[in-house]
């Protein structure tokens, strides 16, 4: 990865803050238990990777459908990992909203707890509503007004507006005809 980043002069390397390996690749973004032990473990690994790569990582908060063994809130967990690992944050605003419904939390409070000086990029997207208590981050629907409102809140926290990506993987709306 380091050789690739150097060869192509890639200034930013981002990754999801999740488990993807348990003795073999899992090909999914599984939630990390939100514990002090996990904060230390993950932060130490991030610091090692940053040392090897010679640059800071940018970590993205993920959508989750279970919160195994949570000892702290997701906002506390993400903020503490970012702090201890001295890395940056790709704030996925739709994931904040999806998790707020799935885990009955306050998405506005989550964004307020994020270290604004470490927010490097933002994502927004649409999702699928399976039930009143379950949303799936699909990137296959229009962005809800509430997600746009959360994006505005995130922008208001920042001294400058960072690059923001609208993720849409399928169910594209028709293009307007000239």
Regions found by a protein language model. Give the residues of each.
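Active-site acidic/histidine proton-transfer and metal-coordination neighborhood
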Residues: 1-89
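Conserved residues at the C-terminal ends of beta-strands
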Residues: 16, 125, 167
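A short, acidic, flexible beta-alpha connecting loop/helix-capping segment that sits on the rim
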Residues: 166-174
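A short helix->loop->beta-strand "cap" motif at the edges of active sites that frequently abuts
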Residues: 55, 158-162
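Gly/Pro-rich active-site loop or hairpin
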Residues: 31-39, 99-159, 175
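Conserved radical SAM core fold
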Residues: 19-26, 126-134, 171-172
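A residue-level signal for conserved active-site and pocket-lining positions in enzyme catalytic cores
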Residues: 13, 92, 164
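Acidic/histidine-rich catalytic cores of soluble enzymes
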Residues: 50-134
């Amino acid at each position: 990865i380091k050789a690739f980043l150097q060869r192509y002069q890639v200034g930013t390397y981002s990754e999801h803050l999740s488990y993807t390996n348990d003795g073999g690749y899992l090909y999914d973004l599984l939630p990390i238990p939100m514990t002090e032990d996990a904060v230390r473990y993950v932060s130490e690994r991030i610091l090692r990777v940053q040392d090897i790569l010679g640059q800071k990582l940018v970590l993205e908060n993920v959508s989750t459908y279970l919160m195994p063994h949570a000892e702290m809130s997701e906002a506390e967990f993400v903020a503490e990992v970012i702090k201890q690992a001295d890395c940056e944050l790709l704030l996925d605003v739709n994931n904040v909203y999806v998790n707020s419904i799935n885990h009955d939390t306050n998405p506005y409070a989550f964004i307020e707890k994020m270290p604004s000086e470490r927010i490097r990029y933002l994502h927004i997207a649409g999702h699928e509503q399976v039930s009143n208590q379950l949303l799936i981050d699909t990137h296959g629907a229009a962005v809800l007004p509430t997600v746009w409102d959360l994006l505005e809140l995130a922008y208001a926290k920042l001294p400058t507006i960072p690059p923001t990506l609208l993720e849409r993987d399928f169910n594209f709306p028709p293009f307007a005809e000239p």
